[in-house]
A protein has these predicted regions:
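A short helix->loop->beta-strand "cap" motif at the edges of active sites that frequently abuts
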Residues: 52, 122, 198-201
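N-terminal nucleotide/polyanion-binding subdomain common to many enzyme families
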Residues: 12-107
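Proline-aspartate-enriched helix->loop->beta-strand connector
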Residues: 174-179, 184
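Short glycine-rich anion-binding loops that position phosphate/pyrophosphate groups of nucleotides
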Residues: 59-63, 182-187, 209
Length: 258
């Protein structure tokens, strides 16, 4: 692997395998994000070539959490694709003269599912996470839109014995795209530990996306999303998150000082 610095010493260029498009890398505190014009296309090319991919959707909260949780930091750095999910990440880059489009993880996941529903080349997906009812409802909602979708599902409330059987199922079924929604940092650590079970698949941590797909919760109105205030709507829906939201001013302070 070859690393080169550009003139600003900010964006690193990495060679990629099999002549895939070369992603730029931008450092975010002790982590980094990959900068691509079309994340979905890049992922689908890798999937077509049988190259497994762990996708992390990075936001300010996860960045600060990774500083306090060495295992999470290691998992993020080991990921094949880290996308700028949060508005704080975009602000961090803009403060350093780099403009890039935000890539919300839920929208990336939805675009992958929609593509699978419209093509015969992706014939198997997997949802892992949520309550038993949520897992079923999320699958049902997507299959109502795309009846040909083949979705393997498992809720996130499983015992150790059930998890062993679930891993065996994954190994046997080999779903092509696996969405894991069991919360940060658990989902990133779980993917890093178990991605060898389906080595040619795309693995994506999707947080609470299953609740939204199942209709249990709503995404923020578009005007909040467009003004980088989606976090405030999540806090409104889940006031218990206020302690976790304390990482946002900490990230902003670090952004100004770094």
């Amino acid at each position: 692997m070859v690393i080169r610095l550009n003139s600003q010493n900010l964006i690193f260029m990495l060679t990629t395998e099999n002549n895939l498009p070369t992603p730029k890398i931008f450092p975010i505190l002790n982590l980094y994000v990959h900068l691509l014009d079309d994340y979905k296309h890049w992922l689908l090319v890798r999937l077509d070539r049988g190259i497994g991919t762990h996708v992390v959707t990075l936001n300010a909260e996860m960045t600060i959490m990774a500083e306090e949780n060495a295992d999470l930091g290691k998992a993020v750095k080991a990921a094949d694709l880290v996308v700028p999910d949060g508005s704080g990440i975009i602000l961090y880059m803009r403060l350093r003269g780099v403009k890039h489009q935000r890539c919300p993880g839920i929208e990336l996941a939805e675009s992958l599912i929609a593509t699978a529903g419209q093509t015969e080349t992706i014939n198997s997906l997997c949802f892992f996470g949520g309550t038993p009812e949520t897992a079923v409802q999320a699958v049902r909602a997507w299959q109502q839109q795309y009846p040909n979708l083949n979705i393997l599902s498992q809720d996130g409330y499983i015992s150790q014995e059930e998890e062993i059987e679930w891993k065996k199922t994954l190994s046997q079924k080999q779903p092509q795209i696996i969405f894991v929604g069991i919360g940060v940092p658990r989902q990133e650590l779980w993917i890093e530990e178990n991605r060898h079970l389906c080595p040619n698949s795309i693995w994506v941590g999707v947080g609470g996306s299953f609740d939204i797909w199942a209709g249990n919760k709503d995404r923020a109105p578009m005007w909040l999303r467009n003004n980088n205030l989606e976090w405030s709507y999540r806090l409104y829906q889940e006031p218990w998150r206020w302690r976790r939201m304390l990482s946002l001013p900490k990230f902003l302070w670090r952004s100004l000082l770094a």
